[in-house]
């Protein structure tokens, strides 16, 4: 979209410049814009890897907005070039994941219909996830909107269809019951699953270790990430791509 906007502005300036001399014929300067969507579709097809793209599930300690947003900007955006991202919606990443479809749905009053109201809603909601590449070659971030009574069922379903999990436990403490449940669910998953866990000096590793004591050996890979620097970003991406 940004690429198209830049070219649109440049061509519009040229069209307006020559319009005084040739009149409406100056609009011909805008014709190259017709080729941009086609070219981007061809580019996306050429980049498409064979087989099913991997799915990344992102979990985190809520109310750690600044750290989670930094992680999203530096890591998740890079992952989107290779595979899908799914997460349980929260206000901490609203400005990172909001797209035009979300805005129009909200304005039309249809946002409530996206919420998972019962366990029976989980399968249809996951079946409706958009897992295709966009025209710019990136995969989308799909969110599941849940109530307090349904997020656990949604989590179990998301774990069942994810290939790798990124769990940001920076600042995690024993009283974070939701994170403890997530850790237990990941540890109990019957399918092959890689879990990359981020921690820092405030992470209660003992409480986390207790929650995953029954996990298969090697399932969890811990990374000490005290800040969102370039070296830390490379380490996280290397762990995700395995």
Language-model-detected regions and their locations in the chain:
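C-terminal interaction surface of TIR/SEFIR-family domains
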Residues: 205-242
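Conserved TIR/SEFIR loop-to-helix hotspot centered on a Trp-containing motif
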Residues: 171-185, 189
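IQ-motif-like calmodulin-binding regions
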Residues: 145
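An anion/phosphate-binding loop that grips the pyrophosphate of nucleotide cofactors and donors
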Residues: 161-162
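Short beta-alpha junction loops
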Residues: 62-63, 90-97, 171, 189, ...
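N-terminal topogenic membrane-targeting module
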Residues: 34-130, 134, 138
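Hydrophobic alpha-helical transmembrane segments
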Residues: 2-32
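Structural alpha-helical scaffold elements that stabilize or flank donor/cofactor-binding regions
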Residues: 157-158
């Amino acid at each position: 979209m940004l690429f198209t906007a830049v070219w649109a502005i440049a061509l519009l300036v040229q069209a307006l410049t020559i319009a005084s001399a040739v009149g409406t014929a100056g609009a011909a300067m805008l014709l190259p814009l017709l080729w941009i969507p086609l070219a981007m579709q061809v580019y996306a097809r050429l980049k498409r890897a064979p087989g099913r793209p991997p799915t990344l599930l992102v979990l985190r300690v809520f109310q750690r907005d600044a750290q989670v947003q930094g992680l999203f900007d530096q890591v998740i955006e890079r992952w989107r070039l290779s595979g899908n991202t799914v997460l349980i919606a929260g206000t901490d990443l609203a400005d990172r994941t909001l797209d035009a479809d979300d805005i129009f749905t909200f304005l039309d009053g249809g946002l409530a219909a996206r919420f998972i109201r019962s366990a029976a809603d989980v399968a249809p909601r996951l079946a409706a996830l958009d897992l295709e590449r966009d025209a710019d070659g990136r995969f989308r971030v799909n969110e599941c909107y849940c109530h307090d009574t349904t997020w656990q069922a949604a989590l179990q379903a998301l774990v069942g269809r994810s290939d790798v999990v990124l769990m940001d436990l920076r600042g995690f403490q024993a009283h974070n019951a939701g994170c403890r449940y997530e850790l237990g669910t990941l540890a109990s998953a019957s399918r092959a699953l890689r879990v990359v866990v981020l921690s820092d000096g405030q992470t209660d590793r003992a409480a986390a270790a207790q929650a995953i004591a029954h996990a298969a050996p090697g399932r969890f890979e811990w990374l000490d990430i005290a800040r969102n620097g370039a070296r830390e970003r490379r380490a996280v991406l290397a762990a995700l791509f395995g």
